[in-house]
Amino acid sequence: LCPRDWLLRGDKCYWLSKGPNNWNWSRDDCWGKRSRLLMLQSQEELDFIQNVTQDGKNVWIGLKVTPPGGKWTWVDGSPLDPARFPVSGSVDGNSCGCIRGRRIESQKCSGSFRWICQKEAAV
């Protein structure tokens, strides 16, 4: 089961924000909902999210460039597998990940986009 206004898919619940904000705000908002920014597991999940967002605009996910070394890292601290999910766009110390259509893009973390939270569905 998922809370009201959340979408169920498999064993996960997803929530898409109505309005935009920056990446840090988005991350904290998900935490406040006892969830985290979306961490993609598969191409099928990306396709599902694309169907949910529909308009093709940028949507924040739980991906950020972390120093040192400037590697893409998910919000749980695990590294991104670039072979599975390549990221397009420039990368610097202030880069965060978003979904646009069927791909992941790098954007400045201060950019204002909608975001997606995810959590485990209650059994």
Placement of each model-derived feature along the sequence:
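Extracellular, disulfide-bonded carbohydrate-recognition/adhesion ectodomains
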Residues: 1-123
